[in-house]
Amino acid sequence: MMQATTKQIGNYVAHSGIRTSGYGYQFWMQPEGGFSCSGMGSQYALMYPEQDLVVITTADAQGLNNAEDFIRESFLKNILHGCQAEALPEDPEAQAKLAEASVLHLPKIEGELTSPWAAKANGVKYVFDDNRWGFKWMKLDFSDNAVQLTYEKHGQVDSFPLYIGEYGPEFLFPEKAAGKRIDILDTNYRCMSQAAWDLENTLVGNVFAVDDYLGCIKIQFTFVEDTMTIFATRWAENFFNDWRGYLAGHAVKE
């Protein structure tokens, strides 16, 4: 066990940030004498034997750049370096702040709530060039607090909302993914979404799976004259697979 939790190899070239302290046997070395287990999406166990300290995080930070460094460096600064031999006195104000900070939050896109393009693109059908993901067309229907995406992919017409400004109620993502068995696509995941106008002609949205499986889609719509260009990235394990890359669509009259 001593060898497993001790630096056996260096990993400076292959990694960056907090992960450059070396690697043992299935354990990552931590700065200042600790070691850790690292799971997907910022699920960590940070262990410091000298301080008799273990910290567990169960975050889902997929798609958030530098989240791992932020979590681990905040731990070093605010917890490890603040350790004392005796317990701190009761501090109701600090406990109230901790309770507020510990509530789960989803990252919010900042931007404008509307744009002239909301009216211009409302209900317009955009037909895509041939693409590897099978998208044929998409249209966006804007209301006061949401935009409904309707699209055809692989011969199936589906739809889901992006809520403008704030996260709206949960909804079932229309494309089925794995449920109890990873090889059977029979489950629609519960999701939450939010969007905002980043530029006058650019709408940006997030879709987060908040079910037994966690993951997210980041999607950007850019409108120029009669075209809509989509850029999407997905951070998920074995689902949201078609929501990545670029799509170019042209407006057509129905």
PLM region spans:
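Intrinsic structural disorder
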Residues: 1-6, 17-20, 237-249
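Active-site Gly/Thr loop motif
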Residues: 2-58
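Structured C-terminal helix/loop/strand segments within mature extracytoplasmic catalytic/sensor domains
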Residues: 39-108
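Peripheral terminal and inter-domain segments
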Residues: 89-254
